[in-house]
Amino acid sequence: MDHLTMPKFGPLAGLRVVFSGIEIAGPFAGQMFAEWGAEVIWIENVAWADTIRVQPNYPQLSRRNLHALSLNIFKDEGREAFLKLMETTDIFIEASKGPAFARRGITDEVLWQHNPKLVIAHLSGFGQYGTEEYTNLPAYNTIAQAFSGYLIQNGDVDQPMPAFPYTADYFSGLTATTAALAALHKVRETGKGESIDIAMYEVMLRMGQYFMMDYFNGGEMCPRMTKGKDPYYAGCGLYKCADGYIVMELVGITQIAECFKDIGLAHLLGTPEIPEGTQLIHRIECPYGPLVEEKLDAWLAAHTIAEVKERFAELNIACAKVLTVPELESNPQYVARESITQWQTMDGRTCKGPNIMPKFKNNPGQIWRGMPSHGMDTAAILKNIGYSENDIQELVSKGLAKVED
């Protein structure tokens, strides 16, 4: 396979990934591949570009390092071109409503006829099969959270609240990335392709597993948090200091003992309710749970964040200031690790945002390109798979492809 023009870098150099999907979930999977060195082709509708393009800044992050192909993959010669592209593709990711591709004639079996080793990842809200009531429904972040039992666990004791920004989309995208790589590992052993069915609600069901297990195996459901505090454990969660907010985790035998001395509860250690060796204090089951919270709230409110961080560092209690977004860039840890970076957009502007993660030591990722324009790489991609200039112009004239203006 001849590759498109791009630098060679990262652990996935030489891999070809194609994705079809809009907004966040499916494209986030593609973005991860692109930042780790894969050649990633982003398929967009010919008439209407990805709706993410209306956002002024986010797509410059989420679509960097991509090659843009504008092609009607379901109709006539456009479909033929898509299937031709699949012959040299390692991983194909599609995000749609249920088995939308199969309904339009592009089944797994059709794809495998053109590439028996192809890894296919289907990403949808409710999966590729199930009941007629749900399978074909549209889904976004909040839908997946609501249907999975994840949303009902979040928010305050008085009202559930979805987790933002777009948690279900990002979790589902990462699931598609890891599942596709797992499948590719097996394909390279067996030579036989794989199809992966990723339902966003099942991803979020798994992400919400911690508290659910008590219900599934005992019938008790943990209540939602109160003012950002862990619903299970005292001394864990969000707390207010004299000049702002921190989060902390009061976990460990020594940590609890030393903290209790500071907040005036040392006399409770060694009691039947908080015996020696206690590593966590259950907010509900321990009768002293509310008292621990009361004393801790009072102590923290009387101290600044700097004082709390200094003292908790001495006691080895996990703690962090709740940073505002403007504080991120100047934070010394961010600076040392270059967590925020800059890159050039296709029109020459400077864009700033999160750097590539995680950091590979021997084969690091890199940002080599900004977000491509609609149809920017259509001609190059079609030429790469054997199409002539005349072939490409014919696709364009029939409205089956769009090339850059």
UniProtKB/Swiss-Prot annotation:
EC number(s) on file: 2.8.3.21
Keyword DNA damage applies: no
UniProt-listed SUPFAM superfamilies: CoA-transferase family III (CaiB/BaiF)
A GO MF term: L-carnitine CoA-transferase activity
Compartments, record wording: Cytoplasm
EC class (word): transferase
Highest rank taxon of the organism: Bacteria
Subunit comment: Homodimer.
Function statement: Catalyzes the reversible transfer of the CoA moiety from gamma-butyrobetainyl-CoA to L-carnitine to generate L-carnitinyl-CoA and gamma-butyrobetaine. Is also able to catalyze the reversible transfer of the CoA moiety from gamma-butyrobetainyl-CoA or L-carnitinyl-CoA to crotonobetaine to generate crotonobetainyl-CoA.
Protein name: L-carnitine CoA-transferase
Name of encoding gene: caiB
